[in-house]
C-alpha cells in the first residue's frame, strides 16, 4: 500500500473532509526542497479523493516574516531592509510589487504546471483582514500559560517580559526589533530598538510569534493535516509546542502530522535558499516533465531523505519511471498530471536522437522508426512532448560527455590496429541489424583482429565524432543509419 494511501486511510477514520496545510516563506528562490512539502500534500489529497473523501490544499505564503539577513544573491542596499516584512520590501529586480511576490509568483505558476491546486493565503493579508484578531487577543491574555507550555516542552525559560506578539514598528518598518510593553482592549503598546515607542491595533499591527502563529492558523483555517520539515518534528520542536498551544489555548485539535526529510542536491547538501544551494522549482518544470518532478518525492516515504542528481542521476530516475509506467505503479499514478501518454521510446534515446536530428521532430521520428520503434499516434505525441524536455535537460544539466556534434570531416589519426578493426567492422555492418547486434559486433570483431574492446569502441567514436567517447554504440549507429556510418568510416580512413 502506498504511503499516501496509508495516510489517507488514517485521515478518513477521523473525518471524510480534510484541509491540508502547506507553508513556505518566500524569502528566496522556492526550490525543489521546498516543493517536497507541496507534492507530499498533493499525493495525500489525491489519495483522499481516490478513497471517496474530500480534500483541499491550503498554501500559506509567510510574507509577513522578516528578511532575516542579506542573502548572497541580494545587492548591498538590502542590508537596510533586514528585519522588515517580506511583503513590505521592494522587488530586487523591479518586476513585481514586492520582494515576496517576486519569489512567490513563479512558484505559484509552477504549482499549476505540476497539477497542484491550492487555496492561496498570504499571511499579511490574513492579519490585515482580522483573521488573527481573536487568537491574538487570547494569546496576549494567556501569555503566561503559553510561556509555561514552551518552557515545559522545550526546556527553555522565557524572560518575564516575553509576549507572543511581534509589533510592526511604525517608524523603521521592522518587525523583529520590537517588544510589547503592555496591551489593553484596543491597543498593543511597544518599544523598538530604533528608539521609537508606539502602539498598534490588533488587526494588521504585527504578528504572533512562530510557535503561536502556527497553532493559531490551524484553528483559523480549519486545518486537519500538515506535512512539515523534520526540524519542526524534533522532540521539543515547533510541532510539539503547537500541539499543546492548539489544545490548551485555542481549544483546537492539532492536525495529523506528516514530517518529511530533506532533499539533498548531490555533492552540495540540503537545499537552502539562504546558502544558494537551490534548484528553483520554476526552472525545474521547464527542464523536466512535471510527472518526473512529482515522482522524485512520491516514489519514497516522506521520512526518507532524497539525494537528487539533476545530471545522470535524473536519467536513471526517468528510466525507473518508464518501467513503472508500464506496471501501472501507484507512485506513477499519483505523479501523472493530466492525460499523459508514454511510448516505448526511452528518454535516453531521445537525447541521442534529438542531437542527431538537430531537434527536428520529423527527422527524430524517422530515426526512431529506423531504430526499431513503432511510430504511431501515441509515439508521435509522446516524442513531440518529451523531445523538448530532452533538449532543455541536455542544455542545462547534462555532463559534457553526453553532448555531441557530428563534424563534417574527421581529422583524427588512427593506429594500424584501429584501422584494421574499423575496416573489418564496417564490412560486417548490415542495415537489417538490430541495435543490440551492432553493439555485440564490436566485441566479436575486436576479438578477431586482436584489439582491446575499449580501444575498438574509441576507434568508432573517433571515426564518427572525432573524440574517444559518445552514446551507446548500437543505438547510435542505428540512429545515424548503418550505410552512413559505413561511408563515414571509409572516409575517416
UniProtKB/Swiss-Prot annotation:
Motif ('KMSKS' region): 270-274
Catalytic reactions on record: tRNA(Lys) + L-lysine + ATP = L-lysyl-tRNA(Lys) + AMP + diphosphate
Gene Ontology terms for molecular function: ATP binding; lysine-tRNA ligase activity; tRNA binding
Organism: Archaeoglobus fulgidus (strain ATCC 49558 / DSM 4304 / JCM 9628 / NBRC 100126 / VC-16)
Principal localisation: cytoplasm
Family annotation (Gene3D superfamilies): 1.10.10.350, 1.10.10.770, HUPs, Lysine tRNA ligase, stem contact fold domain
Lineage, highest ranks first: Archaea, Methanobacteriati, Methanobacteriota, Archaeoglobi, Archaeoglobales
Protein family (similarity comment): Belongs to the class-I aminoacyl-tRNA synthetase family.
Protein name: Lysine--tRNA ligase
Tree of life domain: Archaea
UniProt xrefs under PROSITE patterns: AA_TRNA_LIGASE_I
Amino acid at each position: 500500500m502506498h504511503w499516501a494511501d496509508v495516510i489517507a486511510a488514517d485521515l478518513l477514520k477521523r473525518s471524510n473532509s480534510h484541509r491540508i496545510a502547506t507553508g513556505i516563506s518566500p524569502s528566496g528562490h522556492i526550490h525543489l526542497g521546498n516543493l517536497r512539502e507541496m507534492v507530499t500534500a498533493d499525493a495525500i489529497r489525491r489519495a483522499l479523493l481516490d478513497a471517496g473523501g474530500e480534500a483541499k490544499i491550503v498554501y500559506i505564503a509567510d510574507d509577513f516574516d522578516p528578511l532575516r539577513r542579506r542573502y548572497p544573491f541580494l545587492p548591498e542596499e538590502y542590508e537596510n531592509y533586514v528585519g522588515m516584512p517580506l511583503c513590505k520590501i521592494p522587488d530586487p529586480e523591479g518586476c513585481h510589487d514586492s520582494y515576496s511576490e517576486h519569489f512567490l509568483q513563479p512558484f505559484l505558476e509552477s504549482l499549476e504546471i505540476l497539477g497542484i491546486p491550492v487555496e492561496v493565503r498570504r499571511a499579511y493579508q490574513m492579519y490585515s483582514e482580522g483573521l488573527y484578531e481573536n487568537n491574538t487577543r487570547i494569546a496576549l491574555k494567556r501569555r503566561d500559560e503559553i510561556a509555561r507550555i514552551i518552557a515545559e516542552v522545550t526546556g527553555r525559560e522565557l524572560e518575564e517580559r516575553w509576549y507572543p506578539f511581534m509589533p510592526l514598528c511604525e517608524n523603521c518598518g521592522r518587525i523583529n526589533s520590537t517588544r510589547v510593553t503592555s496591551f489593553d482592549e484596543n491597543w498593543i503598546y511597544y518599544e523598538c530598538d530604533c528608539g521609537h515607542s508606539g502602539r498598534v491595533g490588533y488587526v494588521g499591527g504585527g504578528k504572533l510569534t512562530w510557535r503561536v502563529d502556527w497553532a493559531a492558523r490551524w484553528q483559523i483555517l480549519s486545518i486537519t493535516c500538515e506535512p512539515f520539515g523534520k526540524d519542526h518534528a524534533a522532540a521539543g520542536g515547533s510541532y510539539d509546542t503547537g500541539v499543546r498551544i492548539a489544545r490548551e489555548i485555542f481549544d483546537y485539535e492539532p492536525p495529523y502530522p506528516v514530517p518529511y526529510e530533506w532533499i539533498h542536491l548531490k555533492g552540495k547538501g540540503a537545499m537552502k535558499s539562504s546558502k544558494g544551494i537551490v534548484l528553483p522549482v520554476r526552472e525545474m518544470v521547464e527542464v523536466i516533465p512535471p510527472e518526473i518532478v512529482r515522482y522524485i518525492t512520491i516514489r519514497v516515504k516522506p521520512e526518507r531523505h532524497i539525494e537528487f542528481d539533476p545530471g545522470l542521476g535524473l536519467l536513471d530516475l526517468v528510466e525507473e519511471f518508464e518501467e513503472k509506467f508500464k506496471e501501472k505503479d501507484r507512485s506513477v499514478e499519483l505523479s501523472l498530471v493530466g492525460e499523459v501518454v508514454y511510448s516505448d521510446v526511452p528518454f535516453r534515446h531521445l537525447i541521442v536522437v534529438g542531437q542527431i536530428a538537430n531537434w527536428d521532430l520529423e527527422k527524430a521520428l524517422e530515426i526512431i522508426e529506423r531504430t526499431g520503434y513503432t511510430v504511431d499516434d501515441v509515439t508521435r505525441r509522446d516524442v513531440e512532448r518529451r523531445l523538448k524536455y530532452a533538449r532543455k535537460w541536455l542544455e542545462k544539466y547534462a555532463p559534457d560527455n553526453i553532448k555531441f556534434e557530428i563534424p563534417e570531416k574527421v581529422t583524427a589519426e588512427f593506429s594500424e590496429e584501429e584501422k584494421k578493426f574499423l575496416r573489418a567492422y564496417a564490412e560486417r555492418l548490415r542495415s537489417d541489424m538490430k541495435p543490440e547486434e551492432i553493439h555485440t559486433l564490436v566485441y566479436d570483431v575486436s576479438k578477431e583482429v586482436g584489439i582491446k574492446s575499449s580501444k575498438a569502441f574509441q576507434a568508432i567514436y573517433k571515426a564518427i565524432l572525432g573524440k574517444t567517447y559518445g552514446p551507446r554504440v548500437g543505438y547510435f549507429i542505428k540512429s545515424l543509419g548503418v550505410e552512413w556510418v559505413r561511408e563515414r568510416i571509409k572516409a575517416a580512413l
